[in-house]
């Protein structure tokens, strides 16, 4: 039997914010039910983990460890149903499941909750498919935890702390959930939801097949994420054009190719968004504590609105920036892109206080994700590159680029920073400091790369975008 090749697809997400009060009430009921069910599943997964972990300690004669306490009646009941479940699998000619090693999965829990008529799993507020999806999500989280835990004991140097067992959600709080396209549909420019006649207008133009709708609670509001499956766009032919990006505060993106094209994105609005939000947050905190100086700052509708407005504006900024990067790559036939990123780069930032605050509040991980998402649709390979010493080394002098460690701390380089924004090479040539960093990131990611060293206009007088919301306004210098 010949296996069919898996069809390659891409995904598009459209976000909507729910303003309708009736719909908010509808989603609140489901979010409460989702939270209760999530805690039920977490309880069962935690109990089974405690039981199997104790077995592991006993079988491997591991001493000086604290044994976990668990609900023995629940474990006995789970084991009884596991036996029946595996017997049913055998009758169907399927392999039995080793629950001790692999843990609980969504299929077994679906069978188990149906068998014992678990109240939260069979809650009529949630559709059966939504309950199944919540179960799958929690069990996957536990499997990922167990995998990382075993890896932690083998390679502790890779981790900053021991992976934590997934915790319970707060009682009487709300958790996210999602609908499949079987229960939540789009017809006649309206989104129809299960178990209600309420609808939500949907006037966006979209291509592809709607596959699911995620419902997320954010800042006391509900956000919908409609996911569409699309055929991939025509992939670009493999070229020898390589690009690299250096991310920063003043120049959000400094991108250059090995063929002598470059671009700076230096819109200051992102810093303004953060600065305005910080002032508003400080004002609200001050108003809360002015009468009681030692009292704790509490969440409020005012604070939620400030955070919400800031995050929406920043997310829009990041989408626009990712689109500019995509446009640059398509215009210059780029087939591979390296983005500089250091592990834990937001935890030990060697900047002055103002720049450090701006750096930490810029969601670079979100920007990297959006760039990857957009470029992958066109077959452009994107990789993250460790970037230690890329800002200190001289790209034009081909300085060696070690990975940071104690031995490399005293490494000397040919050039130096002349002043803010400029780098001076060994020959005294002044180039843009961020583009020098981008070239070094390229050299680290692709050691055999050859780049333009004769015509340095792309390093000295690059194209610049100063307003991302109007990316056609490109100036020189």
Model-derived segments and spans:
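Acidic carboxylate diad motif detector
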Residues: 72-218, 357, 361
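Gly/serine-rich nucleotide phosphate-binding loop at the start of the catalytic core
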Residues: 1-131
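Generic detection of short hydrophobic beta-strand segments and adjacent strand-loop junctions
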Residues: 7-18, 198-204, 263-268
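Short amphipathic alpha-helical coiled-coil/interface segments
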Residues: 34, 82, 135-142, 303-306, ...
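Long, hydrophobic, amphipathic alpha-helical segments used as structural scaffolds
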Residues: 42-49, 142, 146-153, 230
């Amino acid at each position: 039997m010949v296996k069919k090749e898996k069809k390659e697809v891409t995904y598009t997400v459209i976000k909507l914010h729910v303003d309708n009060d009736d719909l908010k009430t509808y989603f609140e009921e489901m979010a409460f039910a989702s939270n209760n069910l999530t805690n039920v599943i977490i309880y069962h997964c935690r109990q089974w983990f405690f039981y199997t972990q104790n077995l592991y300690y006993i079988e491997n004669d591991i001493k000086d460890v604290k044994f976990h306490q668990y609900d023995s009646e629940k474990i006995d009941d789970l084991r009884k149903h596991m036996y029946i479940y595996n017997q049913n699998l055998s009758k169907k000619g399927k392999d039995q499941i080793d629950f001790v090693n692999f843990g609980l999965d969504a299929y077994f829990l679906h069978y188990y909750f149906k068998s014992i008529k678990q109240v939260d799993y069979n809650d009529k507020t949630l559709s059966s498919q939504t309950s199944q999806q919540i179960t799958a999500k929690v069990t996957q989280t536990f499997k990922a935890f167990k995998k990382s835990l075993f890896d932690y004991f083998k390679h502790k140097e890779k981790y900053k702390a021991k992976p934590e067992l997934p915790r319970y959600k707060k009682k009487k709080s709300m958790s996210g959930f999602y609908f499949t396209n079987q229960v939540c549909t789009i017809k006649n420019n309206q989104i129809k939801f299960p178990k209600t006649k309420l609808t939500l207008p949907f006037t966006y133009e979209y291509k592809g097949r709607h596959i699911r709708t995620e419902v997320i609670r954010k800042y006391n509001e509900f956000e919908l994420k409609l996911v569409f499956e699309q055929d991939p766009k025509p992939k670009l032919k493999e070229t020898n054009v390589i690009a690299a990006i250096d991310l920063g505060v003043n120049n959000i993106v400094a991108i250059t190719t090995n063929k002598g094209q470059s671009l700076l994105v230096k819109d200051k609005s992102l810093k303004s968004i953060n600065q305005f939000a910080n002032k508003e947050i400080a004002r609200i905190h001050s108003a809360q504590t002015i009468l009681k100086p030692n009292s704790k700052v509490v969440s409020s509708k005012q604070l939620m609105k400030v955070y919400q407005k800031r995050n929406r504006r920043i997310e829009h900024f990041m989408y626009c920036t990712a689109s500019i990067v995509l446009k640059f790559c398509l215009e210059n036939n780029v087939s591979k892109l390296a983005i500089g990123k250091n592990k834990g780069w937001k935890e030990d930032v060697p900047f002055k206080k103002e720049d450090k605050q701006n750096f930490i509040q810029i969601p670079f991980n979100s920007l990297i994700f959006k760039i990857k998402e957009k470029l992958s649709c066109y077959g452009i390979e994107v990789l993250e590159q460790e970037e230690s010493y890329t800002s200190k080394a001289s790209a034009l002098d081909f300085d060696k680029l070690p990975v940071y460690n104690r031995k490399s701390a005293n490494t000397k380089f040919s050039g130096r920073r002349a002043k803010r924004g400029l780098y001076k090479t060994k020959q005294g040539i002044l180039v843009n400091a961020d583009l020098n960093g981008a070239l070094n990131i390229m050299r680290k990611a692709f050691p055999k790369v050859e780049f333009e060293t004769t015509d340095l206009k792309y390093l000295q007088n690059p194209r610049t975008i100063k307003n991302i919301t109007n990316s056609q306004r490109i100036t020189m210098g």
